[in-house]
A protein has these predicted regions:
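Helix-turn-helix
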Residues: 22, 26, 30-64, 68
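Amphipathic alpha-helical packing segments from all-alpha helical-bundle domains
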Residues: 75-78, 125-149, 158-162, 170, ...
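Amphipathic alpha-helical linker/stalk segments
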Residues: 11, 69-97, 140-146
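N-terminal intrinsically disordered/low-complexity leader segments
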Residues: 1-18, 203-205
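Amphipathic C-terminal alpha-helical segment
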Residues: 104-108, 112, 144, 161-182, ...
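Hydrophobic/aromatic residues within well-ordered alpha-helical segments
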Residues: 19, 62, 69, 73, ...
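Short secondary-structure transition hinges
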Residues: 97, 104-140, 151-152, 159, ...
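Hydrophobic alpha-helical connector segments
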Residues: 68, 83-108, 160-164, 188
């Protein structure tokens, strides 16, 4: 048995939840750098400081592990968007808070953002279903406010919600990829002004 394997085996056992979190963190790093298809379970286990059998005790396959990482960060982003919308009763401030939530997510967790929006697995049905659900859940939170405030039909409000969410996501992604000289605050203000000028054109009830 190798020295590294002996070291891993002699390490104190972490509680199951802590070990799972450690594995998910290591997997995110490897999947982001290598992509799903080139990522190796050996590398993920080594980065997490566990043996490969331990990794497989938690996640029976590489796809199971990938989906668990995806679910964790989808839930995190959806929560941040919902929290932003609920943070103020003022609609202009809601738009700003929602845009800022995307930029905040990408600034604090660029690896997770790349996993969600630049995945080489987006055509995999189980991945596509989760990404669609993420978009729907974020857009639904926005559209509920639009429908309530304007009286627009739910289908119309949902389309507008998808448009707002999509714009925030794409501009935040561009800001990250281009290493923009604009500060986060400047970028958020620009995108918020664009969105608010559009959505405020719909009269309130």
């Amino acid at each position: 048995m190798s020295t590294s394997a002996n070291f891993r085996d002699n390490k104190p056992r972490l509680p199951r939840d802590e070990r799972r979190a450690l594995l998910l963190s290591a997997a995110l790093e490897v999947f982001t750098v290598a992509g799903y298809h080139s990522a190796a379970m050996d590398e993920i286990a080594d980065r997490a400081g566990v043996s490969k059998p331990v990794l497989y005790q938690h996640f029976p396959s590489k796809l199971d592990l990938y989906l668990a990482v995806l679910d964790l960060h989808i839930d995190s982003l959806v929560f941040e968007i919902q929290k932003a919308i609920a943070s103020t009763p003022d609609n202009a401030n809601r738009v700003r808070a929602t845009v800022d939530a995307y930029f905040g997510f990408i600034e604090s967790d660029g690896e997770a953002f790349r996993l969600l929006f630049e995945s080489d697995m987006s055509v995999e049905p189980s991945v596509a279903e989760r990404l669609d659900r993420m978009t729907y859940d974020c857009a639904a939170a926005v559209s509920a406010i639009i429908s309530l405030d304007t009286g627009l039909p739910k289908e119309v409000a949902m389309l507008l919600g998808v448009g707002l969410i999509g714009s925030a996501q794409v501009t935040a992604r561009h800001w990250l990829q281009r290493d923009s000289k604009l500060s986060r605050q400047q970028a958020v203000e620009l995108v918020e002004n664009l969105m608010w000028r559009g959505i405020s054109g719909f009269p309130s009830k």
